[in-house]
């Protein structure tokens, strides 16, 4: 049977949300490929994990969730060397399985791990790779994977095909789609495979893991993101965005313009040339809404725009718009949130001058 694979990600034995997003993409592709070639296509979720509880092993309930969210099969490759990400060993493990089972398509998330793993894997399998895709589809008639991604600095969208080599491989931007809802009635198989010790790269040993103190990657996982753009006018004014983000308990984002001007660092950039996000609330101030930026926030649940220009493109996508001076709106909103938080805590908010 033909197969479409998605490579799941785990941390400490817990599956990351991007694993379920990928399954939604994979399910659609497997169904379309099956219709195009006239035969069933199985969606397989490949999990690389540790072999002991408490040391990166993914339990049965978590693997079962992959079935409930769209997979037909789950293959968990397990071994102590897979408890934490190590590119050479991960790549060797997936390549060994791929040579045996010959999937048509392999997808991974365009995370730091996926962006490291997939090029190594493509070289090992003598296959092509399209990175940072925002759209994937199956071409009618040929059954080829259509891989769409931003090109030329995000100014155009290019669609790429791989007609002559298998597997077809792509990384997909996190938060560019939503996971399928869980369906407890779905049936599927779960297979655990022990990693062949010969595949372990002995040159690399993971001694420990440390979390990024600045939490830049949290932007993609944040439920609230506050972004600033060119309308802030200068770097010092970006504090208005940070203060509002703090008041909302959210992460700080930025438009490409703001990053290019040095007001925020690249890990905060939102859009096709930065990070694709899907928070519950996205509030942007001074962002006009270039097409690349809009594409990076299109799956946000609620979008609020603050911009003095009533014709700014961002207003067309926003659920709520404020046509006004951000230098008045943001401080007032931050102050109102601070007052509400203080009231909830039973404290009187401080006024300018230090008295309540």
List PLM regions with ranges.
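N-terminal glycine-rich FAD/FM-binding segment characteristic of electron-transfer flavoproteins
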Residues: 1-356
């Amino acid at each position: 049977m033909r197969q479409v694979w998605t490579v799941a990600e785990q941390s400490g034995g817990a599956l990351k949300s991007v694993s379920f997003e990928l399954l939604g993409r994979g399910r659609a592709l497997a169904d379309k490929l099956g219709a195009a070639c006239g035969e069933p296509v199985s969606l397989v979720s490949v999990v690389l994990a540790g072999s002991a509880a408490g040391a990166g092993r993914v339990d049965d309930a978590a693997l079962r969730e992959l079935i409930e969210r769209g997979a037909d099969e789950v293959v968990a490759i397990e071994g102590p060397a897979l408890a934490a990400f190590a590119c050479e060993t991960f790549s060797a493990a997936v390549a060994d399985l791929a040579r045996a089972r010959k999937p048509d398509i392999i997808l991974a998330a365009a995370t730091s791990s996926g962006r490291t793993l997939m090029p190594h894997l493509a070289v090992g399998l003598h296959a092509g790779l399209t990175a940072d895709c925002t759209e994937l589809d199956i071409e009618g008639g040929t059954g080829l994977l259509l891989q769409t991604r931003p090109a030329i600095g995000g100014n155009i969208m290019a669609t790429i095909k791989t007609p002559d080599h298998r597997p077809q491989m792509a990384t997909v931007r996190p938060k560019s789609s939503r996971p399928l809802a869980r369906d407890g009635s779905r049936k599927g198989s779960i297979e655990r495979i022990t990693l062949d010790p010969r595949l372990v790269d002995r040159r690399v040993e993971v001694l420990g893991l440390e979390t990024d103190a600045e939490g830049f990657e949290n932007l993609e996982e944040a439920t609230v993101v506050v972004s600033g753009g060119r309308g802030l006018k200068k770097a010092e004014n970006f504090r208005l965005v940070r203060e509002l983000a703090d008041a909302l308990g959210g992460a700080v984002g930025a438009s490409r313009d703001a990053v290019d001007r040095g007001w925020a660092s690249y890990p905060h950039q939102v859009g096709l040339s930065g990070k694709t996000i899907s928070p519950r609330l996205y509030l942007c101030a001074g962002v006009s809404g270039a097409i690349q930026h809009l594409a990076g926030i299109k799956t946000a649940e609620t979008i609020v725009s603050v911009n003095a220009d009533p014709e700014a493109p961002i207003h067309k996508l926003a659920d709520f718009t404020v046509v006004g001076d951000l230098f008045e709106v943001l401080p007032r909103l931050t102050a109102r949130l601070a007052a509400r938080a203080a009231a909830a805590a039973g404290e009187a908010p401080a006024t300018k001058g230090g008295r309540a």
